[in-house]
Regions:
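Signature for HUH/AEP ssDNA processing cores
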Residues: 1-103, 107-129, 213
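Catalytic "initiation/cleavage/transfer" segments centered on a nucleophilic residue
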Residues: 1, 126-214
Length: 214
């Protein structure tokens, strides 16, 4: 999908090409937005950095899909598609591919413009259910994380989900695609009218460590 006959350039290049006949866009919010009406919400899940406590909580709930329907019960009746990331189970010929550590789930929402707020709401619900945690960045900053990534809710971001182009002697044993037929659903709302706040979550972590910091 996307625009036909478009060239994606940097913002500086676009300014230089304004007078040319080329139809240019930048991969920024200046040129990318959410459509009116229905759209697909991306839930990006990866177990690579999950602390043991969060993995245990997911296991107690019955696995990742049970955890997702715990924080968002309407998901059970939704249209959604689950695919691995482009790099999942890619390996050199003759070697055993590593297990896929996550997936991309695309959920059909009634209003695409609700995608950013939906991810923030799900992130807050994750923290309420013991599915949130903190990471320490290389610079020493405390980063808020949960079993889904909030950052993918911006329309200009790339999602590496398509099958990769493989070079010689490189193979891929892709996990199967899961297609669930349902309906377009309303976006989840913030629990108890709370707004997700980094300051609040850090304060909660300091007062009562319900999630691990790594």
């Amino acid at each position: 999908y996307g625009e036909r006959d478009m060239i994606v350039v940097t913002r500086g290049s676009k300014n230089r090409l304004r007078t040319s006949s080329k139809n240019c866009i930048t991969r920024t919010k200046d040129d990318f937005g959410f459509p009116d009406g229905e759209g697909w919400l991306l839930l990006d899940h990866d177990t690579k950095d999950l602390p043991v406590s969060v993995k245990s909580k997911m296991a107690d709930l019955g696995g990742i899909f049970a955890a997702l329907t715990t924080i968002w019960p309407e998901l059970a009746g939704a249209d959604f598609l689950v695919r691995p990331s482009s790099s999942a189970r890619v390996c050199i010929a003759g070697e055993t591919p590593a297990d896929a550590t996550g997936f991309h789930m695309f959920v059909r929402l009634r209003s695409a413009s609700d995608i950013p707020s939906a991810l923030r709401a799900l992130h807050a619900r994750c923290w309420q259910h013991g599915l949130g945690y903190h990471l320490i960045s290389k610079s020493g900053q405390m980063l808020d994380r949960s079993i889904i990534h909030v950052s993918v809710g911006s329309p200009e971001r790339l999602s590496f989900t398509a099958p990769p182009i493989l070079g010689p002697n490189v193979l891929r044993q892709a996990p199967p695609t899961v297609c669930h037929e349902g309906v377009a659903v309303d976006a989840p709302r913030q629990p108890y009218d709370l707004t997700w706040s980094r300051t609040r979550d850090i304060a909660r972590q300091t007062a009562k460590p319900e999630a691990d910091a790594r």
